[in-house]
Amino acid sequence: IENNIENIVNGVFLTRDLVSEPPNYLNPEKFVTEIKKLTKLGLKVDVFDHLKMKKIGMNALLGVAQGSKNLPYFVTITWKPSNSKNKNPLSFVGKGVCFDTGGISLKPAKFMEDMKYDMAGAGAVVGLMKTLALRKSKSYVIGAVALVENMPGGSAQRPGDIVKSYSGKTIEVLNTDAEGRLILADAIYYIDEQYKPELIVDLATLTGAIVVSLGNEYAGLFSNNDKLSERLIKAGEIENEKLWRFPLHKNYDKLMDSKIADIQNINYSGGAGSITAAQFLQRFLKNKTPWAHLDIAGMAWTKKDLDIIPTGATGFGVKLLNKFVEKFYE
């Protein structure tokens, strides 16, 4: 038991360390360097640079990154034990915006420093993969992180631009600060297409709207699959990383239709921002794969000391997903 707790703590602490780093230190390239250190635990790390992504058409991800001098990366992390219980991998996808100014749709200056935390989804995926490797999980698992910096440079994406995503679908970018869903669109579609996973769970500090809805007590859960949702909620209850499920519906989905592209990246009606963001992501499943989206924007960091968490990054998601894998897939 002690060893198992230590393995979990090591994953959580890695996530906290990554998420708490200042943004001038932890840019996408440095993040990749940190991920590569995990190969000594038996994890396989594959890195796509901007040239590889351009070649295969990850233009939604590349569009977000084009205003920054810090180049983007897409990284897959594989844990495949010889005795794995599952033929098709469980997959976890993390949003890794190492700093988010909002781009040309610039954020207000107040509290912008918190946007160093906008890679907390990716941080959680990396911490999870470390824990799974340390405890020699019996499940075949793929972690994937999309790493970018969203900056308002001279070459930055403009509101009104249209990009052709990896899926082939065109996206009208109405707001460059709705960027997390753009990088996840390419990441989710790639994982679904290439690995045909048993399930996909994505984690992202995706919307401010989820904080309005749930504050700092629950993360938002959105899913196309009841069984997957129930399992995630149960794991969250056990680990005190609580999830609250929101609806998905065709009427919300319609709000993301663009008049000049396949989809637009924001709905300006002003309501249900977290739901419409999830509806956007759902359109980038290639197959009918069980999928869940965790919007962790209210849970990824804390402004005050909590019982066992000091001010800063919380490491939210590592314990939850480790328990989810352990309880239901091993």
Segment roles from a protein language model:
Residues 1-41:
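Phosphate/ribose-phosphate-bearing ligand recognition and processing surfaces
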Residues 15, 29-330:
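A generic structural signal for tightly packed, nonpolar segments enriched in small/aliphatic residues
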